[in-house]
Amino acid sequence: MVEFLGDVLYDLKEFSDTRFEVVALFRMIVASICGGLIGLEREMKGRPAGLKTFSLVCVGATLAMITNEYISRNFGGSGDLARMAAQVISGIGFLGAGTIIVTGTNQVRGLTTAAALWVTAALGISIGAGFYFGAFGGVGLIFKIGRASCRERV
């Protein structure tokens, strides 16, 4: 057991990069806030997915990108860095599909929630890659689109 803990501590010291770890933590916090804001807005409107779901999706996508960067830095990864992002985007489609229902009257419900989850994953990828301008612009546009769609129709 002591030998195992020694190996773990050695690995932590060997691969520790304090600056990278601080940046990674910052990115996850930003993702949590951005995803949480979108989720809170959806929750306040009584939609099926809310604060926790959107925060988790955004943080998860961010973490996937951070992990991708970590692997590339520490293990000489010459692989395609965009591959992880592509897998997140396609994988989130399955989660979004679970929110879509077609009622007995052929009315589709949950489509906007699915789209919002998808775009939140894209925000997480953006944050995980360190592209904050794109992420913050995306959050602003999401709120603008959400408000525009809530106006009364004549």
Model-derived regions, located:
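Residue-level detector of conserved catalytic or cofactor/ligand-binding positions
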Residues: 144-154
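Loop-to-transmembrane alpha-helix initiation sites
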Residues: 83-84, 130-140
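Alpha-helical transmembrane segments and their membrane-interface boundaries
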Residues: 1-84
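Ligand-binding beta-strand-loop-alpha-helix segment within the catalytic cores
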Residues: 69, 85-95
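C-terminal ends of transmembrane helices
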Residues: 35-47, 95-108
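Alpha-helical transmembrane segments of multi-pass membrane proteins
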Residues: 35, 61-65, 92-99, 142-146
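Small-residue-rich segments of transmembrane alpha-helices in multi-pass membrane proteins
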Residues: 56-66, 90, 114-127
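Interhelical loops and loop-helix junctions of multi-pass membrane transporters/channels
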Residues: 13, 77-85, 89, 102-118
